[in-house]
């Protein structure tokens, strides 16, 4: 049985090296200022904070005070607020004051909100191994029935393909133009979406892998991973601490999650998969898979998948873990990597 201390060290090994981010925004000043107690560099979901208003530069008495974080009302208990049902990461507490003479002023103060709990550590068990094209620099992986849709990368080598891991039959394999570096892919509302890395463009294909539409990125500068929740939410990673929510029809970036443990913000969520109500993210340059709460960005678990790469053919091109697809009928995950000769069917297990 793994001790709590060893679990924390292993979590650090699987996540460490991902750039944690500091909140360095300034506090806007208006007709009043606010103090937050306790004074801390970071807070956690579930914390209760006491808010006091100082140095009012307006006439009249305060009649009403309201609080928001990320345009969402915050639970209040008198002069206290409770950090619950909120997005994590670098946020702003917005305090609005209305006086008895009808005037209203608002100030904002930055808050760093982290997850409430330490991520759970999970392991894996291999059920089956299947051949995988060792020339495929895997960037995206998702099932349609028993067919895998796979996006591959590298300039002059990128492609979008459909193949069956059980029969090894390749149904279609369409190369991208040499100027594009293929990235994550997902199957959404009958269409196949594929990102590119730094070309600021995504492709929308029909089931015959013909391009029917393209879309541009917004604030994000790169395309990494892509998945959806099965109904109306698309998620896109870009290598930063953010996972972007895309509009289900235009694919424009409309909001974002920030990835947090109870210790820090984290970056480098790579290829994405949505399964069982969670986002599963390959961690770039690490043998770990993050399990992310799509409602707030909390990293709730980390799957230690060390050892898989040791089981593939050692070639000069073999690269990092990347590629995770959930088979909803078999209730298993299929995992591979860039230029790996195998794809592994696994289940994840609690690390008791």
Each predicted region: which residue ranges?
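Surface-exposed, short loops/turns at beta-strand junctions within beta-sandwich domains
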Residues: 83-90
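Short loop/turn segments that connect beta-strands within beta-propeller blades
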Residues: 163-168, 206-210, 248-251, 293-297, ...
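Beta-strand-rich domains and repeat architectures in extracellular enzymes and scaffolds
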Residues: 127-159, 173-186, 337-339
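Conserved beta-strand positions in repeat-built beta-propeller and related beta-rich domains
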Residues: 150-154, 194-199, 234-240, 281-285, ...
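A short beta-strand motif characteristic of beta-propeller blades
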Residues: 125-131, 169-175, 210-216, 255-264, ...
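A short helix->beta-strand "capping" segment at the edge of beta-propeller domains
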Residues: 114-135, 165-171
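C-terminal motif of bacterial Sec signal peptides marking the signal peptidase cleavage site
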Residues: 17-20
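Beta-rich, blade/repeat-based domains predominating
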Residues: 134-145, 178-189, 219-232, 263-275, ...
């Amino acid at each position: 049985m793994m001790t709590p201390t060893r679990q924390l060290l292993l979590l650090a090994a699987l996540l460490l090296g991902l750039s944690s981010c500091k909140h360095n925004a300034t506090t806007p000043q208006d007709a009043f200022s606010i103090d937050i107690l306790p004074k801390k560099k970071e807070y956690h979901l579930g914390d209760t904070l006491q808010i006091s208003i100082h140095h009012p530069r307006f006439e009249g008495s305060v009649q009403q005070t309201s609080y928001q974080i990320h345009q969402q009302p915050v639970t209040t208990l008198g002069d206290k607020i409770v950090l619950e049902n909120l997005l994590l990461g670098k946020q702003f507490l917005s305090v609005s004051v209305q006086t008895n003479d009808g005037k209203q002023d608002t100030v904002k103060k930055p808050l760093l909100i982290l997850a409430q709990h330490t991520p759970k550590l999970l392991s894996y068990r291999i059920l089956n191994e299947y051949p995988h094209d060792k020339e495929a620099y895997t960037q995206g992986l998702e099932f349609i029935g028993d067919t895998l849709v796979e996006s591959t990368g590298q300039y002059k080598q990128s492609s979008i393909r459909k193949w069956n891991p059980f029969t090894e039959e390749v149904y279609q394999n369409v190369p991208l133009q040499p100027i594009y570096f293929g990235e994550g892919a997902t199957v959404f509302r009958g269409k196949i979406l594929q990102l590119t890395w730094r070309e600021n463009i995504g492709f929308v294909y029909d089931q015959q892998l013909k391009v029917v539409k393209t879309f541009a990125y917004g604030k994000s500068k790169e395309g990494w991973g892509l998945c959806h929740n099965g109904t109306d939410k698309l998620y896109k990673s870009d290598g930063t601490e953010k996972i972007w929510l895309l509009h289900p029809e235009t694919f424009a970036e409309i909001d974002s999650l920030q990835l947090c443990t109870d210790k820090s913000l984290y970056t480098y969520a790579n290829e994405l998969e949505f399964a069982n109500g969670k986002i599963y993210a390959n961690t770039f340059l690490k043998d770990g898979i993050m399990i992310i709460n799509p409602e707030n960005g909390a990293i709730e678990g980390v799957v230690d998948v060390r050892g898989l790469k040791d089981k593939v053919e050692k070639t000069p091109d073999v690269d990092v873990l990347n590629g995770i697809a959930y088979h909803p009928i078999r209730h298993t995950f299929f995992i591979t990597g860039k230029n790996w000769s195998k794809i592994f069917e696994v289940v994840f297990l609690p690390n008791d």
